[in-house]
Amino acid sequence: MSDEKTQLIEAFYNFDGDYDGFVSVEEFRGIIRDGLPMTEAEITEFFEAADPNNTGFIDYKAFAAMLYSVDES
């Protein structure tokens, strides 16, 4: 497994506080507020883009896709 993939998996599980395989908007918001200078609007925009079905949760695949899309822009 590549170092990049390992880091991405570790990041996902840092967000997934209850280790259920999904990151809720509350888990996401809590971690972001502790570490990154994002506004509430930016947090909402990021999460909505990662959760197009509006379930309130994102899985690892959606999490990775969003991080890669942010990195490429």
From Swiss-Prot:
GO terms for cellular component: myosin I complex. Pfam families: EF-hand_7. Residues 3-38, 38-73 form the EF-hand domain. Ca(2+) binds at residues 16, 18, 20, 27. SUPFAM superfamilies: EF-hand. GO terms for molecular function: calcium ion binding; myosin I binding. CDD domains: EFh (cd00051). This is Myosin-IB light chain. It comes from Dictyostelium discoideum (Social amoeba). The lineage of its organism: Eukaryota, Amoebozoa, Evosea, Eumycetozoa, Dictyostelia. The gene is mlcB.
